[in-house]
């Protein structure tokens, strides 16, 4: 903040002095400074917030001779503005009034109401419903590092659900492990942040990185910090953690304590993830396969969007977690597949389960908001609604013979706190307000004193009307009214002409106490009216006070049952994911994959899950299924390599991606888009498909390609699956060919992994003669009348052409350019055959085709059209042999007429 230091030699108001003092302690955050019904921002904070939020920038007072910039947002709409600021990378310190203004006045007329920061709002510490995506986890991640050996670990927490995990990592895996979790915020020690070895990773992550003092990550003090946070005397029940893991856990907890100030979100005990338990997918592969987001950052078009049939927020998050971290143990994958199989076999029951699941709110997030003091009556209502749905699901499953995973989930649901569920049902009204301060959320009959206070508060109009009638009868003034305003409270009002009955005698004056004289009226009160007003006011305050006490009581009970509530919610998510994957499998015709520890990779009639659905939505031609068999050719052998050649637009990239996606789906525990699938678990998946540059880091498309290819060749092992597309195309032809050639040889001899390698270098097909595990396959095409028809079928063999000119024609290049390209191609091919290619280049007339008259397109005759229409109307898959023979005779007859 410029020009706002506390030592500035200028007289400021006490309020502004207070602001500057608080801001000095929160220099890295925008300060939301509470003033009445607004959060105000000043100085540079105001300028930044005004631009980010599109709100008016005004001014308040002067500092160093210049106006102080100011802007503000209403308290009731603060969440909407916080959402925009967080999305733009800002952190916000929320400063509230922590004493009543009346208390401040007791210290003197110029005393300022005490204020303090009650919370730091950062991307990784959100709990508000408006600020969170229901289908996406909101992780805060901390990186721990030990001195000396530099060992690394990551701990990640979603305070909106209580999820807490930790795992060791290494410098070469660090970026991949971070991107797998995809945290909203990464907290690192400031010493690590400036480390030359790690800094490139932090630069890639950008604004999400938050450096913090190294003392927060002290592994020696971690045990005490963990014990204090979880309120335990020993960590014996937490399992064993390494020093870097303790450092990461300490950093994560310390940052939560720092941002939540006095609140303590209820977290699960940290769960350790073991190395190798999940499929390693490097960041480039994760991006190119568009698992959770497309290359443009959108959810639509991603694999997650294509397979998501969940109906709850928790289920959507669990599905995303499984997709981004597929398992590598067949023993762990099988129970998930068993769950989907059971759901498919019990479709009627599963439909009933999904109807119940649709009524399940986000219980873990409601619980977290309640625990940190940001919850409301509707969060308690969410728990009650969730308990009701869970009870319905438990009833539906009563007596059902379930597979292991679903049986464990049912057990967790049955252990939910039934007593607390009944308590909520008795206590909460049917219609709940958003804010607890609005009252009205406690059911009538739950608390007798509350009912009494409400009656007095709500029946005040009837009581006042009765008193007004008594005063009219007593004074004889028929126009007498009892009214109310915020200044006088309740008062009696009569016209000036009628005031004599209330002022002419001493008895009347003592009875009716004069309060105010207006131009045409006079206002009075009575002891009786004042006492009634006090009772009414106190009744409203007392009713709200009782309700708030009940709210706190219910909240405390909810937090006390946090573990069982979260366990039940997690179980409901398991049922949601299992039934959703069953719906997907039934809807799309997926099969159960056979997953084991072998090196097999045999996909029969595989399809691309995203492209297939897109074609169906567009009512286009159906997706062409293809086989892929990378299994060892003999027992004990290594996986195979397929060298794929074929034209542009032939479907090579789609084929490559679909096999990688099938492996991911199988290992996450889903059925797969294929006729059958036998997959030996993949431990590392690498994909280099599609071209992109990295201009910000000074890297060309070719350089990016080489860096990613190097990572693959250096890390792939026999259980890996490698997908490579067009390696070497970004440089001179012979350079590219030699790099691609050497890469395939290395994959075959050194990595010995299963691989799909697509290329336009047809010379590489000769490798099949020297590499025993390499097979040539190609994308089939048909040529007809100078046109090429892409069949999108994979077949054994090799392509001898790329059909680039035909693709250029389909893309809409001017006919003159296409004709010129065809002439150049023919002469280059002839020159290559005769060894005179360079001389022929010089002999080509310079774009002479531009001078040629473009040939008119042939007119289609009616008879030709009749024949074409007849062919187009054929559905080959639906014809019997007899019908096909009859059709051949008919077409021959039409052809004869033509």
Swiss-Prot record:
Which keywords accompany this UniProt record?
Answer: ATP-binding, DNA damage, DNA repair, DNA-binding, Nucleotide-binding
> Binding positions for ATP?
646-653
SUPFAM superfamilies, alphabetically?
Answer: DNA repair protein MutS, domain I, DNA repair protein MutS, domain II, DNA repair protein MutS, domain III, P-loop containing nucleoside triphosphate hydrolases
A single GO CC term for this protein reads: cytosol
A Gene Ontology molecular function term of the record: ATP-dependent DNA damage sensor activity
Supply the InterPro entries for this chain. Answer: DNA_mismatch_repair_MutS (IPR005748), DNA_mismatch_repair_MutS-lik_N (IPR007695), DNA_mismatch_repair_MutS/MSH (IPR017261), DNA_mismatch_repair_MutS_C (IPR000432), DNA_mismatch_repair_MutS_clamp (IPR007861), DNA_mismatch_repair_MutS_core (IPR007696), DNA_mismatch_repair_MutS_N (IPR016151), DNA_mismatch_repair_MutS_sf (IPR036187)
Does Manganese count among this protein's keywords? no
Q: Which GO terms describe its biological process?
A: mismatch repair
Top-rank taxon, per record = Bacteria
Q: Which NCBIfam families match?
A: mutS1 (TIGR01070), PRK05399.1 (NF003810)
UniProt similarity note = Belongs to the DNA mismatch repair MutS family.
Q: What does this protein do?
A: This protein is involved in the repair of mismatches in DNA. It is possible that it carries out the mismatch recognition step. This protein has a weak ATPase activity.
What is this protein's name?
Answer: DNA mismatch repair protein MutS
Q: Which species? A: Brucella ovis (strain ATCC 25840 / 63/290 / NCTC 10512)
* Gene that encodes it: mutS
């Amino acid at each position: 903040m410029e020009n706002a230091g506390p030592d500035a030699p200028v007289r400021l108001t006490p309020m502004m002095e207070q602001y500057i003092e608080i801001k000095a302690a929160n220099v890295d955050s925008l300060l939301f400074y509470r003033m009445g019904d607004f959060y105000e921002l000043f100085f540079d904070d105001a300028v930044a917030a005004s631009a980010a939020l599109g709100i008016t920038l005004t001014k308040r007072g002067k500092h160093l001779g210049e106006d102080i910039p100011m802007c503000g947002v209403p308290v009731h709409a603060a969440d909407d503005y916080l959402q925009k600021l967080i999305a733009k990378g800002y952190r916000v310190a929320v400063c509230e009034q922590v004493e009543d203004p009346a208390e401040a006045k007791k210290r003197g007329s110029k005393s300022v109401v005490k204020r303090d920061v009650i919370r730091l709002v950062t991307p990784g510490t959100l709990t508000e419903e408006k600020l969170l995506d229901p289908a996406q986890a909101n992780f805060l991640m901390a990186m721990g590092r030990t001195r000396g050996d530099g060992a690394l670990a990551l701990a990640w927490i979603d305070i909106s659900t209580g999820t807490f995990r930790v795992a060791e990592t290494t410098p070469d895996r660090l970026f991949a492990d971070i991107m797998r979790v995809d945290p909203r915020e990464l907290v690192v020690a400031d010493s690590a942040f400036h480390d030359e070895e790690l800094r490139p990773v932090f630069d890639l992550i950008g604004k999400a990185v938050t450096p913090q003092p190294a003392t927060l990550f002290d592994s020696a003090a971690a045990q005490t910090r963990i014990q204090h946070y979880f309120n335990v005397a020993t960590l014996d029940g937490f399992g064993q953690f390494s020093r870097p893991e303790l450092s990461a856990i300490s950093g994560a907890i310390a940052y939560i304590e720092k941002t939540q100030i006095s609140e303590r979100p209820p977290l699960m005990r940290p769960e350790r993830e073991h190395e190798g338990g999940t499929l390693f997918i490097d960041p480039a592969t994760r991006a190119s396969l568009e698992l959770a987001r497309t290359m443009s950052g959108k959810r639509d078009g991603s694999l997650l969007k294509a397979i998501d049939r969940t109906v709850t927020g928790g289920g959507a998050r669990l599905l995303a977690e499984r997709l981004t971290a597929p398992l590598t143990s067949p023993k762990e994958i099988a129970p998930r597949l068993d769950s989907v199989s059971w759901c498919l076999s019990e479709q009627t029951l599963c439909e009933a389960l999904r109807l119940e699941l649709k009524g399940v709110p986000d219980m873990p997030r409601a619980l977290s908001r309640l625990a940190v003091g940001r919850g409301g009556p509707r969060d308690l209502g969410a728990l009650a609604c969730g308990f009701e749905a869970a009870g319905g699901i438990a009833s539906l499953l009563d007596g059902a013979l379930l597979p292991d995973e679903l049986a464990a989930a049912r057990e967790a649901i049955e252990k939910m706190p039934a007593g607390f569920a009944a308590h909520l049902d008795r206590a909460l009204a049917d219609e709940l307000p958003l804010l607890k301060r609005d009252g009205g959320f406690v059911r009538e009959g739950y608390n007798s004193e509350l009912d009494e206070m409400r009656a007095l508060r709500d029946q005040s109009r009837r009581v006042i009307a009765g008193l007004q009638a008594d005063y009219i009868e007593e004074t004889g003034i028929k126009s007498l009214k009892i009214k109310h305003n915020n200044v006088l409270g309740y008062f009696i009002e009569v016209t000036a002409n009628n005031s004599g009955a209330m002022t002419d005698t001493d008895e009347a004056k003592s009875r009716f106490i004069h309060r105010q004289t207006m131009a045409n009226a006079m206002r009075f009160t009575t002891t009786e009216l004042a006492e009634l007003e006090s009772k009414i006011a106190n009744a409203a305050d007392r009713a709200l006070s009782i309700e708030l006490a009940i709210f706190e009581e219910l909240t405390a009970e909810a937090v006390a049952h946090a573990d069982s509530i979260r366990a039940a919610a997690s179980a409901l998510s398991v049922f949601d994911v299992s039934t959703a994957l069953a719906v997907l499998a039934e809807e799309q015709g997926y099969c159960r994959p056979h997953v084991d520890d072998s090196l097999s990779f045999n996909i029969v009639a595989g399809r691309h899950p995203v492209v297939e659905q897109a074609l169906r939505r567009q009512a286009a031609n159906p997706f062409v299924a293809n086989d892929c068999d990378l299994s060892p050719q003999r027992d004990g052998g290594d996986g195979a390599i397929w060298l794929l050649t074929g034209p542009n637009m032939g479907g090579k990239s789609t084929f490559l991606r679909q096999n990688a996606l099938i492996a991911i789906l199988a290992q996450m525990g889903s059925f797969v888009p294929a006729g059958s699938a036998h997959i030996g678990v993949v431990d590392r998946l690498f994909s280099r498909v599609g071209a992109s540059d990295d201009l910000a880091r000074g890297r060309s498309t070719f350089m990016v390609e080489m860096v990613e290819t190097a990572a693959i060749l250096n890390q792939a092992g026999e259980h890996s699956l490698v997908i490579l597309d067009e390696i070497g195309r970004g440089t001179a032809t012979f350079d590219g060919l030699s790099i691609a050639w050497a890469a395939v040889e290395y994959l075959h001899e050194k990595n010995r992994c299963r691989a799909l390698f697509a290329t336009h270098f047809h010379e590489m097909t000769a490798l099949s003669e020297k590499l025993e595990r390499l097979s040539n396959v190609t994308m089939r095409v048909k040529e007809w009348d100078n046109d090429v028809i892409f069949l999108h079928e994979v077949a054994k063999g090799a392509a001898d052409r790329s059909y680039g000119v035909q693709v250029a024609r389909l893309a809409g290049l001017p006919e003159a350019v296409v004709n010129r390209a065809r002439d150049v191609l023919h002469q280059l091919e002839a020159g290559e055959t005769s060894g005179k290619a360079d001389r022929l280049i010089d002999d080509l007339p310079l774009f002479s085709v531009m001078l040629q008259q473009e040939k008119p397109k042939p007119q289609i005759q009616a008879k030709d059209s009749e024949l074409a229409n007849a062919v187009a109307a054929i559905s080959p898959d639906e014809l019997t042999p007899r019908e096909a023979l009859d059709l051949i005779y008919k077409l021959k007859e039409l052809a004869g007429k033509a």
